[in-house]
Amino acid sequence: MSKARVYADVNVLRPKEYWDYEALTVQWGEQDDYEVVRKVGRGKYSEVFEGINVNNNEKCIIKILKPVKKKKIKREIKILQNLCGGPNIVKLLDIVRDQHSKTPSLIFEYVNNTDFKVLYPTLTDYDIRYYIYELLKALDYCHSQGIMHRDVKPHNVMIDHELRKLRLIDWGLAEFYHPGKEYNVRVASRYFKGPELLVDLQDYDYSLDMWSLGCMFAGMIFRKEPFFYGHDNHDQLVKIAKVLGTEALNAYLNKYHIELDPQLEALVGRHSRKPWSKFINADNQHLVSPEAVDFLDKLLRYDHQDRLTAREAMAHPYFLQVRAAENSRARPQ
């Protein structure tokens, strides 16, 4: 059995009410308090709008959920309630439903996001360090509360660059971590899926989020979005193997007694490890430092138990400047 290196027993030690989302009784608010202003996005499970709270004229985000199992909606709500107030976690303000259709909507705090395809190419070396550090705060917090996000990707990281404010959003795939539990591997978005999902290892843990973060980080520093560009789940593992090599992949599979299905094994083939230096070019060299590469290398590991935890990641030398700036703000001279 594989078990998380950190925060493994959070839900074992908490009362059942904390993680038993199926028992949740939803307190419905008043739908008429909110009006839709404009559509800002859509996902597989929802449509998202900028809205306004008509009582105080404050902007908000309205996430109208598509017909999905009640259980899944309860899970998302319970997780958002448990995490509310945590660093850089999007705040759930209200839950309402349509009187007639019974369609539920989640009301969130407003974030003036710039699309990552526009924002990321403009970010400086320091900006990337700053925002990844802010994202790590959210991940360490949710992990410390016994929750895996399971869908970390640029689309789910809202950044208001003017205010230098980051929020981790879309907790629809998030789940409570219970040691030894076997989870669905059909989570996360293809380019950000950890090897554990691609080889069908079900007793994964928080470290899945650290792989996704690594993919996101690689895309940012190498200006290659997405970094691992697979055309389907099998091809996704092939793309990873062409960078990390097949020797380390086989060591991983052997350690956890995993057999690849023969078709996938044939597709993966044999590849040597590609050094990170091969991804450096004139366009991205100003973002790639030895510390950045060392940090990336400690995230993008096949073996989920070898990856940095969010807390360990925050202590990495790559964030030295960010930590120094934070400390001087906390203790003004």
Curated annotation (Swiss-Prot):
Q: Which InterPro entries match?
A: CK2_alpha, Kinase-like_dom_sf, Prot_kinase_dom, Protein_kinase_ATP_BS, Ser/Thr_kinase_AS
- Alphabetically, which GO biological process terms does the record hold? flower development; inflorescence development; photoperiodism; regulation of cell cycle
Report the GO molecular function annotations.
Answer: ATP binding; protein serine kinase activity; protein serine/threonine kinase activity
Alphabetic keyword roster: ATP-binding, Cytoplasm, Flowering, Kinase, Nucleotide-binding, Serine/threonine-protein kinase, Transferase
SMART domains reported in the protein's UniProt record: S_TKc
Q: Which GO terms describe its cellular component?
A: cytosol; nucleus; protein kinase CK2 complex
Question: Where in the cell does this protein reside?
Answer: Cytoplasm
Record-stated family: Belongs to the protein kinase superfamily. Ser/Thr protein kinase family. CK2 subfamily.
Instruction: State the gene name recorded for this protein.
Output: HD6
Q: Does the keyword Transmembrane helix apply?
A: no
Q: Where is the active site?
A: 151
Subunit notes for this chain? Monomer.
UniProt protein name:
Casein kinase II subunit alpha-2
In what residue span(s) does the Protein kinase domain sit? 34-319
Task: Give the residue range of the signal peptide.
Answer: none
Report the protein's function: Casein kinases are operationally defined by their preferential utilization of acidic proteins such as caseins as substrates. It can phosphorylate a large number of proteins. Involved in photoperiod sensitivity (PS). Increases days-to-heading under natural day (ND) and long day (LD) conditions, but not under short day (SD) conditions.
PTM summary: Autophosphorylated.
Q: Which organism is it from?
A: Oryza sativa subsp. indica (Rice)
Pfam families from the entry? Answer: Pkinase
Instruction: Give binding positions for ATP.
Output: 40-48, 63
Q: Which PANTHER family match?
A: CASEIN KINASE II SUBUNIT ALPHA, CASEIN KINASE II SUBUNIT ALPHA-1
Residues annotated as coiled-coil are none
Q: Which taxonomic lineage does the organism of this UniProt entry have? A: Eukaryota, Viridiplantae, Streptophyta, Embryophyta, Tracheophyta
Tell me what reaction this enzyme catalyses: L-seryl-[protein] + ATP = O-phospho-L-seryl-[protein] + ADP + H(+); L-threonyl-[protein] + ATP = O-phospho-L-threonyl-[protein] + ADP + H(+)
